[in-house]
Amino acid sequence: MTIVLSRTARSIPPNVFERMDRTVAQARARGVDVIDLSKGNPDGFPEARIRAEAKAAVDSPANARYTPFDGKPLFLQAAAAWYAHEHGVALDPATQLFAIEGAVDGLAAAFAVLLDPGDVVAFADPYYPSYHCMARMLGAEELPLPARAELGWLPDLDAVPGETWDRVKLLVLNYPNNPTGAQAPPEFFARAVELAARHGFAIVHDFAYAGLSVHENQKSLLTVPDARDVGIEIVSLSKMYAMAGWRAGFVAGNEQLVAAVKQYHYQMGSMVTSFVQDAGAAALAGDQAFVREQAARYAARRAIVAEGLRATGYNVFASQGGLYVWAQAPAAMTGEELAARWLGEAGVAALPGSCFGRTGAQYVRLSLLQPSQRLHEAVARIGKLSPDMEKLHA
């Protein structure tokens, strides 16, 4: 018997990260020493005080029970404190914050409560693949906004006609950006908020890489006056505190949207693990030196990869934040061809830019989540392919 699956199940695109994991595993099974720069899986370890809080929390009998649906008050208060001391934003923990199991959990809920079949969702291209996948599963119409290198890999919001904005139900922003590492200046966010108010759409800002900038930290969307009238922000603890495997984050901002996400999540999600919330509260409310140290470490790694590739002849975007390097393939190649060559001939795995939309088709994304020694080795291996570069750039 063949079981007929739902339209939703039939519409799910392949996961590009899972596919690359299989490709890397197959290469390693053949004996290749692969330096995997394809995935944003942090190689750090939560600092000692966060681990100590988690260990102590495991031994608390109260933490063997279900937690409050919205999140433990301690965690939500710590999230509010983080917004206050890091961004100067005052939030009500009871109505403007909600605990989630990482950014994708919050994104899925936000997409679900905002989009009906046929609704239009806009996002910059290149984009994090889940935006496309979630839109497709919900039957929404996608409006990619091409980001431009000359604009610092930001889209030109004013290039979109007013009648097109009138059709948009949701605008998704993501800065520091995955995959490009671009950051958005305050005036960009302010313009997005102005357009949302004028044309009646909501904004979701995916703030997964908060705190991880090269120089000046990316500002929160919620620092913009009136931003809370039109949108929410989704923050993850995965990258800031090297807690990717622990799964925690929060939704913040507009009370109506936060309430809708809560109601959806009550039925379709799960509470964040109790002791993870306790550890997360310690991370958020305490000193942020660990985050600054991580940002400095990633900046040093970024310099290794970016400068090494430039020395070989590649055009590399001067990314301002996040965990990735965004490099252009030579003129005669696509990003897919370049990534295949790097893996096949140098044992270096990177993701083709086409995984992130059409605009990135001639680019590759390299993650910085390997020790510096391995990054130096990756650049050296790629450099050995350089005799062909003059021909490829012709």
What are these regions (language model features)?
Residues T2-S6, R10-G102, A109, A283-G286, ...:
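N-terminal small-domain helix-loop-helix segment of the aminotransferase-like
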Residues A81, A332, R341-L351, F356-A394:
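PLP-dependent enzyme catalytic core of the Aspartate aminotransferase-like
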